[in-house]
Amino acid sequence: MSVKWEKQEGNVGKLTFEIEQEKVKEGLDRAFVKVRKTLNVPGFRKGKVPRQIFNQRFGEEALFQDALDILLPEVYSAAIDEAGIDPVDTPQVNIESMEKGETWVLTAEVTVKPEVKLGDYKGLEVEKRETELTTEELEAELKQLQERQAELVVKEDAPAENGDTVILDFEGFKDGVAFEGGQAENHSLELGSGQFIPGFEEKLVGLKAGDEADIELTFPEEYHAEDLAGQPVVFKVKLHEIKTKEVPALDDELAKDIDEEVETLDELKEKISKRLQEAKEESVAQAKQEEVIAKAVENAEVDIPHAMVHHEADHLMNHFAQDLQAQGLTPELYYQFTGQTEEAMHAQMEKDAEKRVKMNLVLEAIAEAENIEPTEEAIDEEISTLAEKYGMEKDAVRAALGDMSELKSDLKIRKAIDVLLDSAVEK
């Protein structure tokens, strides 16, 4: 096969490749078998017309496009292998020459994986973070657990304060007319939670059960409902009841309520301390990893093709849809609730996608610079881990992974991250 690669501006180039006559003939034969099944030719049963009769009636050229469709995936794959390029998008293939009895000549405008110019990635300075759990952190966790056990009790003849929960009716009016979605009865609202638009909860502070009030507010300019954004409104409210939190004492009894496996507060503290210590060490390690990767990426130069960003954004959108589905929602319902559009969400995803693409490209370049190749032992160990995680046999995991290219790529990137971490300097 004759192949020619001409690099053009940026990450785009022109790939010229040929399909020799022997291969063309194979494609035409396969195309005829496919097409013949659908043909009705007088004098022959359906699907039984001979090749010679077909050529006489329709001409061999009638098979060219079907033959090309059959051959193109194989010959294009061989062409990019021979050219030594790594496409990142599906190309537009053009026919330069497709004559009967001659070699077919094709061209494709191909966007390829960009080259990465690495900067400094070893010996990078990172922040030294404290890994030891502090008394304050333990006390804060205990206080949260204590407050979760709090009970709401009715507040008699006392004004509402931040942190209280009020039961109220409300109805919103714009220009004296009630607007859609602005009404509720016996609604439970924790003051200070920020569930309502700015100012609403603050103006309930100081009211008592049985009080009625008109609350004048202006909707935020960025509010999702266009007819209300930036508009002045009045909410008529009536408070039915005010409840306040009654927090139990932090003692052995509360400890047993929080965790049935402990008998005393000291046992609970010890158990929580261990969990928090492990979580803090993991969090510090993660923060260090993110910082050192970010610095290596910042030091590198790479011109990222938009196609890579777009594909990654599509990938993120699919994950987003799956997360919504797990919550019993659909993207359509989410957009309806938030007032956002799919296009706006995709544009937002592209910002994250560009960062992810650059990070992966830089880590792959580091792996290449360090001559990192996963060993068979490392591959087998990872397969064992996956088999245990998903409850599968190792052979089934191997079959699902196919040529192992994705697994090998993941392992190489992990090793590249280890290179960054092992050489990082904490200051």
Swiss-Prot record:
One of its GO terms (biological process) is protein unfolding. It is found in: Cytoplasm. It catalyses: [protein]-peptidylproline (omega=180) = [protein]-peptidylproline (omega=0). Its EC number is 5.2.1.8. Pfam families: FKBP_C, Trigger_C, Trigger_N. Residues 163-248 form the PPIase FKBP-type domain. GO terms for molecular function: peptidyl-prolyl cis-trans isomerase activity; protein folding chaperone; ribosome binding. Keywords: Cell cycle, Cell division, Chaperone, Cytoplasm, Isomerase, Rotamase. One of its GO terms (cellular component) is cytoplasm. The keyword Methyltransferase does not apply. Belongs to the FKBP-type PPIase family. Tig subfamily. Involved in protein export. Acts as a chaperone by maintaining the newly synthesized protein in an open conformation. Functions as a peptidyl-prolyl cis-trans isomerase. This is Trigger factor. It comes from Listeria monocytogenes serovar 1/2a (strain ATCC BAA-679 / EGD-e).
